[in-house]
């Protein structure tokens, strides 16, 4: 079965997190977060999701900020390679064609409420962490999870994401933007280096990310700066320059709009949390 070899026990991970402030994370492939205990808040460029135990998030490849609000939380992470997802769509194409098509912009995060069937599926996935099993069993369990997603109220959104994966330009665009978003390029430079006309580039970008290139680049830069702020000793002015902001004052304004406080206050809060933990 296609993809079975890549979905062994080591791929499904049980994580224990205690994140008082927002922490920057990069997912190099699509996947599912399942909140087992505690709290979990996940933000992308235009949405915030606060999960209760039993709820699930399908997240696309990309960058996010996460927090557990200082609570000990247990999360199940299920990575999904593009190859596996494409195989799922091909394998069950006739059945999945029954899912209503969605014309809305494709989101970066899709939330799924807890249901008895999803709870049973998650229980089976957790069992794979503690018992030896054939790799194909993990594949079947994850296909079951995706099928439940597809025929839930959020199924049309999920299918929009999965159908995009068959477009060879989508993954190339994602890799290209992750590599070059810090470059001081005009939008025309991005489109030229990608090998597309500006109008076509904008259309592809909007269909993949659901926002304009300028908005996405600004968000990625502010998230990168946030990560440096919390995890390095660089000065704020150096962080602003490193993340592609024209000045410290512009960075401070952008950061305040995004996180509701100044960079210096955010760093102070991180240091206070660290002192309490010590």
From Swiss-Prot:
Domain HTH araC/xylS-type positions: 171-269
Reported regulation of activity: In the absence of inducing signals such as low Ca(2+) or host cell contact, the T3SS/injectisome is expressed at a low basal level and exists in a quiescent state due to ExsA sequestration by ExsD in a 1:1 complex. Upon host cell contact, this interaction is disrupted by the anti-antiactivator protein ExsC leading to ExsA activation.
Subunit structure of this chain's protein: Homodimer. Interacts with ExsD; this interaction inhibits ExsA activity.
DNA-binding region in chain numbering: 188-209, 236-259
Signal sequence region: none
Superkingdom of the source species: Bacteria
A cellular component term, taken from the record's GO annotations: protein-DNA complex
Name of the protein in its database record: HTH-type transcriptional regulator ExsA
Any one GO MF annotation of this record: sequence-specific DNA binding
Biological role stated in the UniProt entry: Transcriptional regulator that plays an essential role in the activation the type III secretion system (T3SS) operons. In addition, ExsA directly regulates the transcription of ImpA virulence factor that cooperatively inhibits the functions of host macrophages together with the T3SS.
